[in-house]
Structure formats: C-alpha cells, structure tokens
A protein has these predicted regions:
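Acidic (Asp/Glu)-rich catalytic clusters
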Residues: 90, 230-231, 334-339
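Acidic/aromatic-lined carbohydrate-recognition and catalytic surfaces
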Residues: 32-223, 231, 238, 242-298
Length: 372
C-alpha cells in the first residue's frame, strides 16, 4: 500500500444556514445571562420544532484520485486506495466526498472525457466504484462526482465520428453535438477538424472540443449519463466550467443549469448539485436563479478571498465583524435568488494555490481558515 506524501486533496467547506448561526449565538448569550438562581430541578420546556438540517448540508472533502492513495503499487492512486482511507476521512469529520473526474481520459487530470459511462482503468473498474459507494454509505458519506459537460476529449467517439463525417462530406448527428464552422474563424479558440474544411471550437485547449449544449439529442444523452451515475448511487454532481457553457452569455448558462437541475431532481430528489462559476460575487450569485443547490463561493476562497484577507487582517475593513457581515450578506443574496440555496464556501481547491502559502505556513491560521 503506497500513500503519497503530497496529496492533491482539498476541502469544499461546510454549508450553514444563517438561522443555525443565530441559534448558536442565542444559546451562548442566554448561558452568559444566567445568574445562577436556577437549578436543574427547576426544569425548562422546549416547545420549538426540531431544527433538522437538510441532508445536503455537508462538509465535502475533494479528492484527486490520481495522487491520493495507491493500492497496487503502480504509482497512481486508485479507487481501492481511496476505500482504504474512508475511515480516515470520516474521522476528520467529513460526511461528503467530491471526486475529481474519474472517467477515461488522455490526461492526468481527466477533465477531457472519452467515455462518460465507465471508469478510467488507472483508477479501477465500475465494480470498484460500486464498492466505494457501498462503503461510503456505511459511513454516511455522500459521494458527488465531477461531471464535465462543457467539452469532451478529441478521443471521444462522439467527436471522432463527427470529424470523420465532415472529412467524407457526410452527415452525422454528432456534428450537431459540437460547435463547427467552415473555414478558420477569427478567434484563436478554433482548430482544424482533421483533414476537413471545418474547424471546431475549444476554448480551454485544442484537446477539449466544446459541446453544443443547445442540441436536444445531446441533452437527451446527457440525461442518460446523469441517470446512469445516479442509479449507481452517486449523490450528485459537481458541474465543471458552468460559466463557459455559453461564454459571455449568463442567461443561456443559467438555462442549461436549470434544465440539468430539474432533470436530476426528477430522477433523485435529494441529489446535490454544485456548479463552478468562477466569477465575481454579483455575477455568480445570479446563477442561483437556475434552482441549483449550490455555487462555489469564490468571493470567500482563494488567496484574495474573504477568509484569507480576514485572517491576515489585510486592510482596515477585514475584521471579524466585516467577515460576519459579508457572510450574512452573501447568504441573503443567494436566498433572494433561490429560497433553497445552500452556500458552498471553500478555502482552496485544485485550481488555486496551496493553503499553507496563504499564511506563511502558520498552522493555527490554516486550521482556523478550514473552520471558516
């Protein structure tokens, strides 16, 4: 069993309702106000309804399987290695796991998906994944997986079929699943499609051709993919690059999220969906109109986010009070767009710098930051 010394593992912070914070504060204040005249024999009545937190309010541990825990000595982390560390994750207080992409891919990060219905052989098999879900259920750990809907790999059968048809001057349903244009468009994000006269759009990298999420046949296929994983026991999805579904068009992006959220909830009502909309506060907040459960709160994460600047006291406005005010304002804003919104604050993830560097390796600050 090989356990890597440098793990690519990060935390998606716990999500708390404002009411819970107020209840805790009220309890503390009432305790301070006691004058000692009451005794246990006097008794107290509690007539309020139980404040049961929704099952989707959890603390998630992000796992990059590739470098987490290697069970077979091949130098690459795998699902069986992750299973062996579930007690460790649970003991730390996490009741949710977010898996970065686990589907077949040509890259180490696996955000260029080849096949949406299987597991990358470096990580294991579908049977291994089923066992992971089974073991997580025993520990009340909910598993969500990264689902990349913005693009695929150029090695996807969808894309290869589309390019082959264009080269032969034939028709194919897969052509409509991507964004193709004849000739070379002015934008740098377009690349030649094989030996054809067509180019395909790929904003991130030429190995990741963008999908056309307005295509109804593609949407039907995506629904099949979502149902496949939900039926396997997945608790939900982390939606990658949701801001880029239609770059520069938030209305269309919100429509895509609404469609996907509505479908997933129709299959599994309690599934949890969180989207990556890497943008400023006012811009990403509007995406809650889609009805999605959560959006990553980028205004609180990263080296420049509210958590880091507060703990580093970076400026006169970064006090504990200003942090509390910002937290309440954020949650009120999210709830104004979606009354069932769940804030998803995070401190750092695979796209940002390492947390230790934010505080000059001050262990106390790092621990407090995770708690915030």
């Amino acid at each position: 069993m090989l356990i890597f010394k440098r793990w690519r593992v990060f935390v998606l912070g716990s999500k708390l309702k404002i009411s819970v914070i107020f209840v805790v504060l009220a309890l503390l204040l009432s305790a301070c106000a006691q004058n000692g005249s009451k005794t246990a024999s006097d008794g107290y009545k509690y007539n309020h309804e139980l404040n049961v937190i929704d099952d989707n309010y959890r603390t998630y541990y992000e796992v990059f399987v590739y470098s987490f825990c290697d069970s077979n000595g091949d130098g690459i982390g795998d699902l069986n290695g992750l299973i062996s560390k579930l007690d460790y994750i649970s003991d730390m207080g996490f009741n949710g796991i977010w898996l970065m992409p686990i589907m077949p891919s040509t890259t180490y990060h696996k955000y260029d998906v080849i096949d949406y219905y299987s597991i990358d052989k470096q990580y294991g098999t579908l049977d291994d994944f089923k066992r992971l879900i089974e073991e997580c259920n025993k520990r009340d750990i909910k598993v969500i997986i990264d689902l990349v809907l913005n693009h695929t790999s150029t090695q996807s059968e969808w894309f290869k079929s589309a390019v082959s048809a264009l080269e032969k001057g034939q028709d194919s349903k897969y052509i409509g699943w991507y964004n193709f244009q004849k000739g070379k468009p002015a934008s740098d994000a377009w690349y030649k499609a094989g030996n054809s006269e067509w180019c395909y759009e790929a904003k991130f990298w030429e190995g990741m051709p963008d999908l056309n999420l307005g295509n109804e046949e593609l949407r039907a296929e995506i629904e099949k993919i979502a149902k496949f994983w939900l039926d396997l026991g997945v608790g939900g999805f982390r939606l990658d690059a949701a801001k880029e579904y239609y770059s520069g068009n938030s209305e269309k992006n919100i429509e895509v999220l609404k469609w996907f959220t509505d479908y997933c909830k129709s299959v599994k009502k309690d599934c949890y969906l969180v989207a990556e909309v890497w943008d400023g506060f006012s811009a990403f907040s509007k995406y809650y109109q889609s009805g999605i459960d959560s959006l990553f709160n980028f205004s609180f994460g990263q080296a420049t986010g509210k958590i880091t600047t507060t703990l580093n006291m970076a400026g006169s406005t970064n006090s504990a009070k200003s942090y509390a005010d910002a937290l309440c304002f954020a949650q009120k804003t999210f709830l104004s767009y979606n009354p069932n919104a769940i804030d998803a604050p995070f401190f750092t993830n695979h796209d940002t710098g390492r947390a230790a560097g934010y505080f000059s390796y001050n262990a106390d600050k790092i621990k407090l930051a995770w708690g915030m």
